[in-house]
């Protein structure tokens, strides 16, 4: 740590985050949450290594720094029980990593992140130099199956000015990440109502641009996630988004530089997933550069 005085570090941190926000055209709140989340996850990795994996929108943020939508929470899948997770989070929050951050964390209710063993939500306040820096939400689930070895992700190096190394975390494999998004996007709720989560379509489009995917691995991940969660069948095609998604989808798409029309997002997502969910064995490899499947 370059700064011995917490107040000096906070002043330098605020200046760095303001510069980052201006350069990237993103709200300052995005950068603040990113830093606070990664410092908390660095503590959790120290307190409970190999006990948890990151999932959801924040995992996507680490896969494509500066390009993913702003997320208000972090989703974590724990390997044992919710009580163990709660204990580990409290212990992690109490760790002093010499970075002038301090955390206060408490359980605030239940959370649904698709884990078989249920989930709970935690609220954390991050402090720097004795003053509130950012408030965070952490959703923790248990009972989720890892379909393949997790990916190792590195947080953006926003604290290099203070000689603080970026956090390293494990996240669910990209194919499983996509499969869980497909499940959430196609799940119906209550009185057979479609999902209201426009963010899932945004995330699917962004992930389709990340890599060259093997058809069999992606198909297997989707089938296994749907079997594990047992809420509905794998669709034969990706359904179109509801009409009332127009406004929320536009806001999210404009934040990440996508076409603001939900129909355009659906066309891209359907090109990526329709052949996979239909089990079209003529498709073998997804080419992200051309947005098409090749034999």
Per-segment meaning from a language model:
Residues 1-52, 62-74, 78-295:
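Structured mid-to-C-terminal alpha-helical surface segments
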Residues 59:
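Catalytic metal-binding/acid-base residues of hydrolase active sites
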């Amino acid at each position: 740590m370059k700064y011995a005085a917490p107040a000096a570090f906070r002043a330098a941190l605020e200046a760095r985050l303001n510069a980052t926000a201006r350069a990237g055209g993103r709200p300052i709140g995005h950068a603040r949450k990113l830093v606070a989340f990664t410092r908390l996850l660095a503590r959790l990795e120290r307190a409970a290594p190999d006990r948890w994996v990151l999932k959801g929108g924040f995992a996507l943020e680490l896969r494509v720094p500066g390009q993913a939508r702003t997320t208000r929470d972090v989703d974590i899948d724990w390997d044992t029980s919710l009580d163990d997770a709660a204990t580990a989070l409290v212990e992690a929050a109490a760790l002093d990593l010499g970075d002038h951050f301090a955390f206060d964390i408490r359980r605030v209710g239940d959370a649904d992140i698709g884990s078989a063993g249920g989930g709970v939500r935690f609220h954390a306040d991050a402090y720097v130099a004795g003053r509130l820096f950012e408030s965070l939400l952490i959703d923790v689930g248990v009972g989720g199956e890892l379909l393949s070895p997790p990916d190792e992700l590195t947080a953006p190096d926003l604290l290099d000015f203070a000689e603080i190394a970026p956090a390293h975390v494990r996240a669910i494999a990209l194919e499983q990440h996509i499969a869980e998004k497909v499940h959430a996007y196609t799940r119906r709720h209550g009185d057979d109502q479609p999902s209201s989560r426009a963010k899932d379509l945004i995330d699917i489009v962004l992930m389709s641009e990340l890599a060259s995917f093997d058809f069999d691995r992606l198909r297997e991940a989707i089938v296994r996630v749907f079997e594990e969660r047992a809420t509905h069948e794998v669709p034969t095609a990706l359904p179109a988004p509801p009409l009332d998604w127009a406004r929320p989808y536009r806001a999210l798409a404009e934040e990440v530089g996508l076409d603001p029309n939900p129909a355009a997002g659906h066309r891209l997502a359907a090109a990526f997933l329709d052949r996979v969910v239909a089990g079209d064995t003529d498709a073998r490899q997804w080419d992200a550069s051309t947005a098409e499947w090749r034999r």
